[in-house]
Swiss-Prot record:
It comes from the Eukaryota. This is Histone H1.9. Residues 1-10, 19-36 have a biased composition (Polar residues). Pfam families: Linker_histone (PF00538). Keywords: Chromatin regulator, Chromosome, Developmental protein, Differentiation, DNA-binding, Nucleus, Phosphoprotein, Spermatogenesis, Transcription, Transcription regulation. InterPro entries: Histone_H1/H5_H15 (IPR005818), WH-like_DNA-bd_sf (IPR036388), WH_DNA-bd_sf (IPR036390). It is found in: Nucleus; Chromosome. PROSITE patterns: H15. Residues 1-36, 118-154 are annotated as: Disordered. Gene3D superfamilies: Winged helix-like DNA-binding domain superfamily/Winged helix DNA-binding domain.
Amino acid sequence: MSLVSPSPDSNAVMAGDQDASTSQVPSQSESKIGPNVATQTLRKPTMSKVILRTVADKGVHSRVSLAALKKAVSITGYNMAQNTWRFKRVLQNLVKKGMLKQVTGKGASGSFRLGKKQAFKSKCKAKRRQRRQKPGQRRTGSRRSLLGSKKSNNRLFKGVRRVAKGRRH
């Protein structure tokens, strides 16, 4: 019995076949990495944040209906058929905390607006924005003082009008 050792050329062919087979089908570790990375980077905002954002976009004193809130939550990617109980629970908790105020209806129905706590926070943010903008406005005011104030211009026009009226008589 003679042992036939495979030639070096046959090893190369076999190795080439193995590489081709592995390159066509992704390994299990590669297929697991792909979806996990995508889900970690694309995270949805919480339901309460979505609700508060939609109510805040409407304004402090305006109302938002339950249907409009459901539509906003479903647009962000939540399945409302499966998450209706969660949606109702989040709404009721926001009302209890004082972040939302229920204008009409009972329970998790009716229309809602921002509560006092949330309205106060939004007013503080608006004041901060105004403070940031004031230095820019002061600069424009100083330029106006160099050119002349509007009050002095109005006084000049009043004097001209009086003179014109006096000449007509």
